[in-house]
A protein has these predicted regions:
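Ser/Thr/Pro-rich, low-complexity mucin-like regions
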Residues: 301-325
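Short acidic/polar, Gly/Pro-enriched loop/turn segments located at secondary-structure boundaries
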Residues: 1-155
């Protein structure tokens, strides 16, 4: 779904996509060893945990709620109330305590760990908890002497962080929200690009919900007002969705600044159900689709403008936005 705002100083869009197993039709049984030579792949475990891997990498699917990473870089995301996912590495065991985190195992079998949300437990003997916003390099989790605090840096994990939310690619003036930004998007001021923010996941969008756009094709503003009689924008069946917010929130322009035309493309791994493009609908769906820690009360300028344009591809997996920013 897409929602956005009504002045060039701020855009926001929301996109829900149909939720299904992230195996591209291939199930991996426990004990299966995977070697990835190029690209990225995302695994959805039966427990609900999601593991996004970037090549070059080697890992083994150990059980419905655990894996072993021999080498490479991964992001582990354990959404909602799920806890207990275990990632084994040559340096030792990393246990989820309700979190998302990134791990890179180098050629010397050391594991560099960064916790994005929540917390993890490192090691079985002398276990140590690592909280969000912290990072550690582990050579042997059995010994506290082989654990070293390092600078927290998420940049090397941004590709797998986005993949863990089902994003296949971004092009143009857009970047994916860093860990921590999704809980407070109103605080992110960025004049250089739009921000794509993952919101709630696995949400039931009921039959009869009104959206702004549900059909593929090119749609130009101004977008229709809320109108239940518009059957072309009403969901005909209840659908489980993940939601994304696309926003632009620039710093206050100077007297000499100039607006510009921006084209942005977002590729999503599964079909987009629809797009919300007006403030009234965006506000209506906030309780269901917004991140639970975000409060949009007080924001005035929401929605897309009359000169904005949105194109949804025929396979519903690519959205192109053209905005004045």
């Amino acid at each position: 779904m897409v929602a956005a705002e009504t002045q060039p100083a701020w855009h926001s869009c929301r996109m829900p996509r149909a939720t299904q197993t992230l195996t591209a039709g291939i199930g991996l049984e426990s004990g299966r060893h995977v070697t990835l030579s190029r690209g990225r792949v995302t695994f959805a475990f039966q427990s609900g945990a999601i593991l996004a891997v970037q090549a070059p990498a080697e890992l083994t699917v150990s059980s419905p709620n655990s894996a072993r990473l021999q080498r490479g870089l991964v992001t582990v995301r354990v959404p909602g109330p799920i806890k207990g996912f275990v990632l084994e590495t040559p340096a030792g065991r990393l246990a989820d305590l309700g979190t998302s985190f990134g791990v890179e195992v180098d050629a010397n079998h050391r594991a560099s760990v960064a916790v994005f949300e929540g917390k993890i437990e490192i090691g079985e003997q002398n276990p140590q908890r690592l909280l969000a916003g912290n990072a550690m390099r582990v050579a042997d989790s059995r010994s506290e002497l082989d654990r070293k605090t390092i600078d927290y840096n998420v940049e090397s994990f941004m590709n797998t962080w986005g993949s863990s939310f089902g994003i296949d690619g971004l092009h143009g003036d857009v970047r994916f929200a860093r860990p921590g930004e999704r809980e407070s998007p109103e605080r992110v001021i960025n004049s250089d690009s739009l921000l794509l923010i993952p919101e709630s996941g696995g949400v039931q969008l009921p039959s009869g919900s009104e959206l702004s756009i549900v059909n593929p094709g090119t749609h130009a503003g101004p977008f229709p007002r809320k109108n239940p009689s518009r059957r072309d924008a009403i969901l005909t069946r209840s659908t489980v969705v993940d939601s994304y917010l696309l926003q632009y929130n620039r710093s206050r322009p100077s007297p000499t600044s100039k607006d510009r035309r921006s084209t942005t493309e977002v590729r999503i791994g599964r079909p987009v159900v629809g797009i919300i493009a007006r403030k009234v609908l965006l506000t209506e769906h906030d309780p269901r689709l917004a991140h639970p820690d975000v409060d949009f009360v007080g924001l005035v300028n929401r929605g897309l403008y009359k000169n904005d344009q949105v194109t949804l591809s025929s396979d519903r997996r690519t959205i192109q936005f053209t905005f004045d920013i």
